[in-house]
Amino acid sequence: KYIAEGVDFRCGYKGSTDVSSIKYFAESNGVKYDFVEPVYYHIAAGEDERISSSYIRSMVLKHFLSTAQELLERPYSVQLEFESGVENKSGGMSFLKSRINQVLPPCGVYYCIVFQKEVRVEITEQEIIIEPAESSNLFDMANLKSEKVFVIEFQ
């Protein structure tokens, strides 16, 4: 068991849980912990931004997926459950945005990776539509739904 947080981390009701609370909890429960100094991302000459989950979410919302990928050191991804989607006639699936708890990029068309294959992802005001780039369908790609969850990697 291990916890790593920033030196200025706060959470809980009115930010009542801080690093001293985490340290006490960790020591009381045999959990290893580290508190790390902030890390900054160089935006432009003389301008740095502190890297945080809030900053990464803002990059995704602004459609700066390459910046989000650079900050995460991996593609930005969204996890979806098969049972929350509806299969469509073209072998793809549709998901209501209201059932997705992760931040999504703005409405538009994206080429992404699902099950190591390229897919076309269309994000509308109401839903996410995933269409295979090949003549297969997502259920085939997932070995007939043996996977309950899949991940969309935005490239």
What are these regions (language model features)?
Residues 1-92, 153-155:
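Classical nucleotidyltransferase
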Residues 75-78, 83-155:
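Phosphate/ribose-recognition catalytic cores of enzymes acting on nucleotide-derived substrates
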